[in-house]
Amino acid sequence: IGEKRELKKVLEKYWAKQTDFNEVKYVAEQLKKRHWNYQKEAKIEFISSNDFSYYDNMLDTSILLGAIPKRFESLKDEELYFTMARGNETCVAMEMTKWFNTNYHYIVPEISKNTKFKLNSKKVIEEYKEALDLGIKTKINLIGAITYLGLSKSVDNSDAFLHINNVVEAYKELLKEISKLDDEIVVQFDEPLFVKDLDSKVLSLIKPVYDGLSSVASNIKI
């Protein structure tokens, strides 16, 4: 959010209709550059991209995977993003709940048996290129498929993990795009769900999911 809470302040201006989204984007770009350069100067070996968020990384992942609840389907771009998080006069916001045992709250994905996944890789690809323009090769951070589905909410009592193959296919498509960005790229899948006591069904997904993702491109290290 910035040392002086720059992101928070510009977002509040934007939500109050005191500025447009171009100023928000400008502040975000400056923060990302500053933070990447801090890490470069500190000689950090693996500097991350796609860890920045305007609001929440789980919300970013829902946008990435195209998991958009039906009530938001008429919206797009930043209006879609912030309405999913905050709601508006006609659309109820998505639920927020605690991220494990922390005081941080995330936007809970809404999944049903009819959920369709469609990759939207724009943020991931653009942030990698932004860092590369500064001479910084980043590792790309992503929330893993198992954690994403495991922390989602079923709105029709269906099993979210019925979609595991669809989510993995979206991630495979993303990895193919990522593989074209550089000769060698590190991708980090965060799976904090693995700290929990998982049932055998979920445990049985880990090997096939990551065997499949690891086989997509020889120049990607997961």
Q: Which residues fall in each region the model found?
A:
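Domain-level signal for soluble alpha/beta catalytic cores
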Residues: 1-222
